[in-house]
Amino acid sequence: MKRSSIVLGVALGILTGVAAANEETELTPVERGEYGPIDKDTSTVLYERPIQITDRVYSAIGATQPETFENFGHNNNLTFVIGDEAVLMINGGSNDELAAAMHEEIKAITDLPVKYLVSENGQRHAVGGNHYWKNQGVELIGHVDAADEVEHYGGQYIEATIRQRQDENYPFTLVDFDTLMEDSIRLDLGGIEVEVRTYGPAHSPGDVSVVVPSDNLVIAGDLAFHIRMPPIFDETDTAGWIETWDVFEQEAGDMLILPGHGGPTDMATVRAGTYDYLIFLREQVQALLDEDGTLEDAYKIDQSAYAHWHTFHELAARNAGRVFTAMEFE
């Protein structure tokens, strides 16, 4: 009887261990904490409160992971520049609640009004909270291509926000930009002038960067990546992105770089995280095309060298497939 009890106990222990292992493997990389805490600061809807980047620039660094209910859609950087007379905000946030929380953080640092808001592109986390800022009298600025993106995908943005907030009645209103730009625009904040410009095709239509010469800083937006794998969309022109990079590096090589995701870094780091990855992926796809490889082969390209990047599991195979599909017709 005692021997049977021991055997039964061992068996139950093994089964419990297997069940626990299975449960662990069913968790997503986000749930396993592979991309950092699921929510870094539970005292605010922001994933993280703003930190000082340079003398005049602060940024609330968003989660380098897909959006979740817990991170409130704060998975990009929400940045602001303080002049002597006014403040420039970069990115409206995913929703009005994030925007309002960000505004409170700004008011805790300066009494100056937010005069301008620049959306780094037309993605939801860049424009979703613009409704709040417009109601504060802030001038909304975006690229003409970003405006087209919002018009085209607006319905999907509403649906995605409702899913992310898990509330069918969650208030979400998209608004138009007040000022549309193409190549560049200069903004006077009093005491300093910043340039909002496009370096060329990059990650998403309408991608713009903000150059702050006084602080030797480029708020690069989604032109540059490092800790997070660059997402490649159906409309992403990877060949154009590589050409754009040459211009970007030539002009901003000695400047501090604040990407759209992740903290500030230098040009060498974002080059490795962006340009080198694009070159690698295109070379791998070209080798497949030369051998009459298929889309299925593209999905299997070995990208394990980049497995340490956040969102690798979500994006690696998808990126390869999209590059393959695009290069078939180049």
Language model segments and positions:
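Accessory terminal helices/loops
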Residues: 15-17, 22-40, 250-252, 264-330
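Conserved beta-strand hairpin/beta-sheet module of binuclear metal-dependent hydrolase folds
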Residues: 55-105, 210-212, 217-221
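Acidic/histidine-rich helix-loop elements
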Residues: 60-76, 150-152, 227-238
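Active-site metal-binding motif and surrounding structural segment of the metallo-beta-lactamase
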Residues: 84-88, 96-141
